[in-house]
């Protein structure tokens, strides 16, 4: 067994020392994110909560019976400059915000050029907008970055402090690598910026806030920033970075945090040396205590060398959920398999034996660019106590599904049921949606699955001209997005937005709160759908 090995470094940003803000007791063990304690219908972080389960529990008005009556409630064109293929991040929805002379449920849209917009969630009226000023001593680069991989953009979905916090703030990690603390009422910075990444343009992913510590991961070595797990303690003002640097960590929802405070993420392909902590193509678990990150456990597939050679990263944010008295995780990646892991022992004594390594569900073509699983997953429990796993997938399926809704050559959403199989578990194929071009991570609410077919052209290698497609070429080849509502038990399409949305989106996703669905697209337009 590995045991608990410490692979971390801790530092205080220089500007904090200059402000005399150093000091304060070290934080104790970080544990127990709120177990779905919210009573208002909000969406405060990527995938809705710290567990990254994509399940909106506070929903009652939209049902499978009336979802066909969904309508566009409003759309608003915002002034927001795109960077590469990036426009808006996943929207955040916050209730009871006093702003612009009233009290509102606010929809927060963070744009690629470090702009943040707060809108009235009921009408689409802009309440405030801000463009966060550059704070790094490294000057900003001209242009939009290196292709579609390393873009000079705000890339991490922000996070809002929980509903029971004494003072609620919005936290945004801008492209200069600095964490911003934003007053929800005005959009003004409430505290000085805190450096979280060593250099600008590090390509971080969804921020997770648990017990006053903000976590993120970075992917693909962009901007010269090491791929690592980052923890910024809002109490002690200390930054901790996991060591050694890893392969790319690029599940779009960032790290997931379990009930005991353990932080989980998946790593992409790269050099592998378990003895030194270099764990490419693996699922990893870290603890955070006394401003120290400690590697707790990991799972590495037995075919990880082949996966690395074929560029089949484990690249999805895992989802955490309770099952039969245990806390489990489900992860996936480009290969098209799913991994179900016990949080107490991800890969068993040999770190290679999870509860389940599924058969190949997709990507029969061993395609590193458009097939398999990308982004993040969702999971929920139906009234009959069945545990469901939902996943976006690309390309044709590799296993038969008992319920289908026509050919799906581009993929879509697949649903699986988790069942006991002796002392193990199994995933049973349940349904596959109709064909969707680049399905984004789904959200489940009140028996309805909401999903965006993003329309993005995801090809990477230009087989005709050589090299990689540029961001501009991928944008040109992308198609308009579509919003779908599906019956969560059968996958039947209950609603489609048809041709109402003229633009596409890239790794943005949607939010569901207050029985409304929110998202933004590449052309600068943000939308709300719901029942009138």
Functional labels for PLM-detected ranges:
Residues 60-85, 98-105, 114-152, 160-201, ...:
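Extracytoplasmic/lumenal domain signature
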Residues 38-73, 92, 414:
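Blade/loop signatures of beta-propeller domains
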Residues 36-39, 532:
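Low-complexity, Pro/Thr/Ser/Gly/Ala-rich linker/spacer regions in secreted
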Residues 1-19:
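Bacterial N-terminal signal peptides that target proteins for export
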Residues 27-37:
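Signal peptide processing junction and immediate N-terminal pro/mature segment
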Residues 16-28:
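Bacterial N-terminal signal peptides
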Residues 89-95, 107-109:
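General structural concept
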């Amino acid at each position: 067994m590995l045991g608990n090995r410490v692979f971390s470094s801790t530092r205080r940003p220089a500007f904090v020392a200059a402000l005399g803000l150093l000091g304060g007791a070290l934080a104790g063990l970080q544990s127990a994110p709120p177990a779905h304690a919210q009573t208002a219908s909000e969406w405060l972080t990527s995938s809705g909560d710290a567990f990254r389960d994509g399940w909106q529990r506070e929903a009652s008005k939209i049902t499978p019976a009336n979802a066909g009556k969904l309508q566009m409630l409003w759309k608003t064109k915002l002034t927001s400059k795109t960077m590469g293929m990036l426009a808006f991040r996943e929207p955040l929805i916050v209730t009871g915000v006093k702003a612009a002379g009233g009290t509102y449920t606010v929809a927060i849209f963070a744009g690629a050029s470090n702009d943040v917009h707060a809108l009235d969630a009921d009408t689409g009226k802009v309440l405030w907008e801000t463009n966060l000023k550059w704070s790094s001593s490294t000057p900003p680069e001209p242009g939009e970055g290196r292709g579609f991989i390393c873009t000079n953009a705000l890339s991490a979905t922000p996070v809002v402090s929980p509903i029971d916090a004494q003072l609620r703030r919005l936290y945004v990690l801008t492209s200069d690598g600095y964490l911003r603390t934003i007053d929800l009422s005005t959009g003004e910075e409430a505290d000085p910026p805190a450096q979280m990444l060593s250099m600008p343009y590090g390509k971080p992913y969804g921020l997770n806030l648990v017990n006053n510590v903000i976590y993120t991961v970075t992917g693909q070595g962009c901007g010269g920033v090491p791929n690592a797990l980052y923890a910024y303690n809002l109490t002690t003002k200390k930054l901790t970075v996991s060591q050694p640097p890893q392969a790319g960590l690029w599940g779009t929802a960032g790290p997931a945090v379990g009930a005991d405070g353990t932080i989980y993420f998946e790593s992409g392909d790269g050099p592998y040396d378990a003895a030194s902590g270099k764990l490419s193509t693996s699922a990893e678990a870290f603890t955070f205590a006394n401003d120290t990150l400690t590697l707790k456990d990991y799972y590495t597939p037995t075919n990880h060398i082949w996966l690395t050679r074929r560029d089949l990263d484990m690249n999805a944010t895992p989802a955490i959920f309770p099952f039969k008295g245990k806390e489990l995780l489900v992860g996936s990646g480009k290969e098209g398999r799913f991994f179900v892991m016990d949080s107490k022992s991800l890969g068993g004594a040999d770190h290679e034996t999870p509860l389940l390594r599924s058969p190949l569900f997709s990507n029969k073509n061993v395609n590193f660019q458009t097939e398999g699983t990308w982004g993040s997953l969702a999971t929920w429990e139906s009234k009959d106590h069945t545990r469901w796993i939902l996943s976006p997938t690309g390309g044709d399926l590799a296993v038969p599904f008992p319920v289908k809704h026509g050919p799906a050559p581009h993929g879509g959403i697949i649903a699986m049921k988790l069942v006991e199989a002796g002392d193990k578990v199994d995933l049973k194929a349940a349904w596959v949606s109709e064909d969707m071009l680049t399905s984004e991570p789904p959200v489940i609410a009140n028996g309805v699955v909401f999903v965006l077919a993003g329309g993005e052209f995801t090809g990477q290698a230009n087989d005709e001209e050589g090299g990689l497609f540029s961001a501009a070429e991928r944008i040109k080849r992308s198609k308009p997005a579509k919003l779908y509502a599906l019956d969560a038990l059968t996958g039947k399409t209950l609603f489609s937005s048809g041709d109402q949305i003229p633009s596409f989106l890239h790794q943005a996703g949607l939010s569901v709160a207050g029985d409304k669905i929110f998202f933004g697209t590449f052309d600068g337009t943000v939308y709300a759908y719901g029942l009138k």
